Amino acid sequence: MFVDFHTHVFHPRIAEKAKMKLAEHYRLFCRCKGTPEDLLLRAGRAGIDHCVALCAATSALQVRPCNAYACYLQNNYPRITAFGSLHPDCADWKKELDKLRASGVRGIKLHPDFQHFRLDDKRLFPMFEEAQKDFIFLIHIGDSLPPEENPSCPYKMAAILDAFPRLNVIAAHLGGFRQWKYALDALAGRDVWMDTSSCMKEIPGDVLRAILKKHPRERLVFGTDYPIMDPQDEIDALQRRTRFSDAEVDEILGNGTHLLFG
């Protein structure tokens, strides 16, 4: 089974608005519609069997509706595994975890840059402690600011791994979007998963080769960042930039199966 481990889908009422926010922040054009139906159509064309849809609440007030949508996706789209969201300002985060568990949601997405908190916020620690038993975390890492100024960075992620060695976590964007040289220093080779989303257009070739040499291929999962990228385009870009063989690309596409389903 081939898995796209990094996608975003939105309710039709807000899909265009959500895409506009993505486009404004990253100064790019979202190629796809951003709906579950469009995601699954494009994934199928690319030979992808299953997708992980990530939800991230931009404020504490958005945690409940965000997780309600994750539960809806989980229970209405058999080819989608949904990840819910937490926020350090949310006082009822334990209840939210219970709701996610009851609906079969076993993943949490954190995006400090969009959610307006820092990844080194100690209020996250009780959440990691409680959820590490039965949840996978996918955490956005990196942006254009220097690591010490950016809400997320590879060094903050490394500190979390030190504090929670049993945490099952995916460091998005090969460990640090636009901070790949720091990801090479702080995360590559560690006991952490990385996804390949939103990397192939920007990552310098020498840094990409160094990360792939240092980080085991069996700890990489494929991701498109849909609706920003089309799945087939991203598969092609992955193979072109990495120069992996068909079998090696298939291995990365299949790694998400082991992570999701054992």
Locations of the language-model features?
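Conserved, mostly hydrophobic/aromatic
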Residues: 6, 43, 70, 100, ...
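Hydrophobic faces of well-ordered beta-strands that scaffold small-molecule active sites
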Residues: 3-7, 51-53, 81-84, 108-110, ...
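Short, well-structured secondary-structure segments
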Residues: 47-62, 69-71, 78-85, 109
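Active-site-adjacent C-terminal substructures of enzyme catalytic domains
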Residues: 163-168, 175-234, 240-247
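Acidic (Asp/Glu)-rich catalytic clusters
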Residues: 40-46, 67-79, 96-104, 125-133, ...
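Divalent metal-binding pocket/active-site signature
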Residues: 33, 57-61, 88-91, 103-184
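Mid-to-C-terminal alpha-helical segments outside catalytic/metal-binding sites
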Residues: 1-8, 13-16, 20-50, 214-221, ...
